A protein has these predicted regions:
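Generic low-complexity segments that are intrinsically disordered, proline-rich and/or Lys/Arg-biased
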Residues: 1-6, 16, 20-21, 26, ...
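Alpha/propeptide regions of enzymes that mature by internal proteolysis
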Residues: 60-403
Length: 403
């Protein structure tokens, strides 16, 4: 398009000098514009100038270019994971290993999660915890490389203690992402892992007491006999999907507590990242149940160019939202780690007001934040030259006025 209208028949022509002055004006405008562009320190400053009056999404408008108002990064290398207390031993093990630069981020995550598996952190990780209805402990785990974006996981793994180790074997010795159940156990044995009973005297006694109490509480709904007062065996009762209260028929009845997972992100001094999770799942679960822990993007997720996320909580709900994938993509859009965590939690709470969740997010610089709902969530981190691990307490989000 011409920068000025062409002269049409019947229109009055501008004087020749006027046309020349318009041309000169355009040339001068172009010269000054180019000078201004060259004076800008970067393209981002030009964009900021051009759109200074534009309205940005609130989570982005509050965050400067680096995603935080002031950096809380301890420096690299760094390890960060869900929960404090007994989980701090895992943080320390992974961090101390990373001080040797020959230890990769994947190595650190595997070591940290396996520490919790061996220590039976809080009874929610490793053998002898969270037995299912048949009194058996099964394990879920995953590990992810933030450079290749490849992950390996195991679900409902039976009779193998080192679930995170088997997950890494899936990553490194197959082109698959997940193996499950008895055949995952077979794979583990052929890769040198030892099959053994994961039941302990404590877990057996706990399950026996649960059965003596009428198998209460449990995760069954819409069955005969009434799962609210009886043990099985259960058969399904009719559910009318056309009824107005269909959604109500699918609600839980007050299931058992206990959804803790170790979910860890490691940042190597070189900037490479890895993430992983390990858990024995929900106590009294229906046999065969798989939680969010081994699901890439739900239990954890990492991209070395952006950051990583770890999650814990009610995995049956959380895996429907892929909160860690959402949080890392929010980092990519410019949110701070804390804002990204809060956004991921709010998306879940909007649909499930009572969901218990905890999200920890860290960007590639080591800046971190967390959010939770339904409980006070904690996360632990150690990095740079820190002499000890710090545990951060995160109160549940106040979302009462949002719904």
């Amino acid at each position: 398009m011409r920068p000025w209208p062409a002269t049409r028949g019947g229109e009055r022509n501008e004087p020749l000098m006027g046309q020349h002055w318009r041309l000169i004006s355009l040339i001068l405008t172009a010269v000054f514009t180019m000078a201004f562009i060259r004076s800008c320190s970067s393209l981002s400053s030009l964009v900021a100038f051009t759109f200074a009056g534009a309205t940005l999404p609130s989570a982005l408008a509050a965050a400067p270019a680096n995603g935080t108002s002031s950096s809380n990064s301890p420096g690299l290398p760094m390890v960060i994971n869900t929960w404090g207390g007994p989980f701090v031993a895992a943080t320390d093990a992974a961090y101390l290993a990373l001080l040797d630069e020959q230890t990769s981020a994947l190595d650190a995550v595997e070591l940290g999660c396996s520490t919790c598996e061996a220590n039976q952190c809080d009874g929610s990780v490793g053998y002898g915890g969270s037995p299912d209805e048949n009194c058996e402990t099964t394990l879920d785990a995953m590990i992810m490389d933030g450079t290749t974006m490849k992950s390996g996981s195991v679900a409902a793994l039976r009779r193998i203690k080192n679930a995170i180790g088997v997950a890494r074997a899936v990553l490194e010795h197959t082109t698959h992402t997940m193996l499950a159940g008895d055949l995952a156990t077979d794979f583990a044995v052929t890769n040198g892992f030892v099959a053994e009973d994961l039941t302990t005297p404590e877990s057996a006694a706990s399950c026996a007491a649960w059965k003596a109490g009428g198998c209460q509480p449990n995760y069954r709904i819409n069955t005969i006999p009434d799962p609210g007062s009886s043990c099985g065996p259960y058969v399904p009762s009719e559910v009318d999907s056309s009824s107005q209260d269909y959604a109500t028929q699918l609600l839980p009845r007050g299931a058992p507590e206990g959804h803790d997972t170790i979910s860890m992100i490691a940042l190597h001094a070189s900037g490479t990242m890895a993430a992983g999770t390990s858990t024995n799942g929900a106590s009294r679960k229906v046999p065969g149940r798989v939680g969010d822990g081994p699901i890439t993007g739900s239990g954890s997720y990492v991209d070395s160019e952006v950051g990583g996320c770890g999650a814990t909580g009610d995995g049956d709900i959380m895996m429907r939202f892929l909160p860690c994938y959402q949080a890392v993509e929010s980092l990519r859009l410019g949110m701070s780690p804390k804002a990204a965590a809060e956004d991921a939690v709010r998306r879940m709470v909007k649909k499930y007001h009572a969901v218990q969740s905890g999200i920890v997010v860290v960007n590639s610089k080591g800046e971190h934040g967390g959010a939770g709902s339904g409980w006070t969530f904690t996360y632990a981190y150690r990095g740079g030259t820190m002499n000890e691990t710090v545990v951060v307490s995160v109160p549940p989000l106040d979302t009462g006025s949002e719904f």
